[in-house]
């Protein structure tokens, strides 16, 4: 069959794989359609847009007001598996919460690894930038260390809730993440930094188990009736979250929108934007889909 492949009648596309992508060639006659991000312009001045999001958040007072009077802070960030511009996001957040009176020594940046490996050394610098790595306490979550977690009871569907104690004990709780389609939670971002991000293996084992994953609503782009989304939202609210800062990226991984504020309201604002640029429909069933997320 390989000898019958005619490159002149093929189409070429690049899948998001690794850091540089993976180019593949397919017989043009077999391709029904290529689905891509709809046209969306990256932010012309992302720093100014982020500053505006922090000053005019959705569902909460401005970040500096939320932080005023707090004695300590824990900021959750995604690990190296997510293309989040953490340094760009963290710098104004750190600046504002210190202006509000929280000492640098009372701030913990916690990498929400879930059950992924820790990000250390050069990888940690790549994640947050040299300046932040050198001057702030940046630590990894270890989901398989039960002594690092605090028990908060059970969720409505019986998920045991064990959350990283460093986050639970912080006076100000902030999550920083990325909103994009997710294969089981509907969309990433928002509540996912807490569960599974800083949950223990005992929590993740149930939440990420077949009882939830096999549900027909636990799928990409679906929030309504999705038990995975509903459970980790409930768990995140139980753990507490004072403020979120989430980014939406374009197809070149450039910031297209920032949302900030209330964990649910700001997240849903970001989801609405993502839906407007990524949701599309194939007109008929196909035999095979090549998907990169």
Residue ranges of predicted features:
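Conserved small/polar residues in nucleotide/adenosyl-binding loops
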Residues: 291-293
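Short internal beta-strands
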Residues: 106-114, 246
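Histidine-anchored nucleotide/phosphate-binding helix
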Residues: 83-102
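Glycine-rich phosphate/diphosphate-binding loops that line cofactor/substrate pockets in enzymes
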Residues: 58-74, 101-104, 239, 279-288
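N-terminal amphipathic/basic leader segments beginning at the initiator methionine
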Residues: 2-52
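Short N-terminal or domain-adjacent regulatory/targeting segments
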Residues: 40-67, 267-278
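Short, aromatic/basic amphipathic alpha-helical patches
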Residues: 121-133
């Amino acid at each position: 069959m390989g000898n019958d492949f005619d490159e002149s009648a093929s189409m070429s596309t690049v899948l998001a794989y690794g850091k540089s992508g993976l180019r593949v060639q397919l017989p043009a006659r077999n391709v029904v359609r290529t689905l891509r991000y709809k046209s969306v312009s990256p932010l012309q001045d992302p720093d100014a847009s982020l500053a505006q999001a922090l000053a005019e958040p959705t569902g909460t007072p401005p970040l500096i007001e939320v932080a005023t009077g707090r004695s300590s802070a824990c900021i959750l960030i995604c690990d190296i598996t997510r293309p989040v511009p953490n340094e760009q996001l963290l710098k104004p957040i750190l600046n504002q919460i210190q202006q509000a009176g929280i000492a640098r020594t009372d701030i913990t940046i916690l990498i929400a690894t879930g059950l992924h490996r820790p990000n250390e050394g050069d990888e940690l610098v790549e994640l947050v930038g040299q300046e932040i790595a050198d001057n702030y306490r940046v630590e990894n979550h270890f989901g398989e260390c039960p002594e690092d977690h605090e028990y908060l009871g059970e969720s409505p569907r019986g998920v045991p809730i064990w959350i990283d104690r460093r986050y639970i004990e912080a006076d100000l709780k902030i999550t920083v993440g990325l909103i994009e389609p997710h294969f089981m939670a509907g969309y990433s971002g928002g509540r996912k930094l807490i569960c599974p991000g800083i949950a223990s293996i005992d929590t993740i084992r149930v939440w990420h188990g077949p009882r939830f994953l096999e549900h027909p609503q636990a799928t990409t782009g679906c929030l309504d009736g999705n038990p995975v989304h509903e459970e980790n939202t409930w768990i995140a609210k139980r753990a507490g979250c004072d403020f979120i800062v989430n980014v939406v990226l374009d197809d070149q991984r450039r910031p297209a929108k920032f949302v900030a504020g209330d964990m649910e309201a700001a997240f849903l604002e970001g989801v609405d934007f993502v839906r407007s640029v990524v949701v599309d429909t194939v007109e008929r069933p196909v035999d095979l889909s090549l998907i990169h997320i």
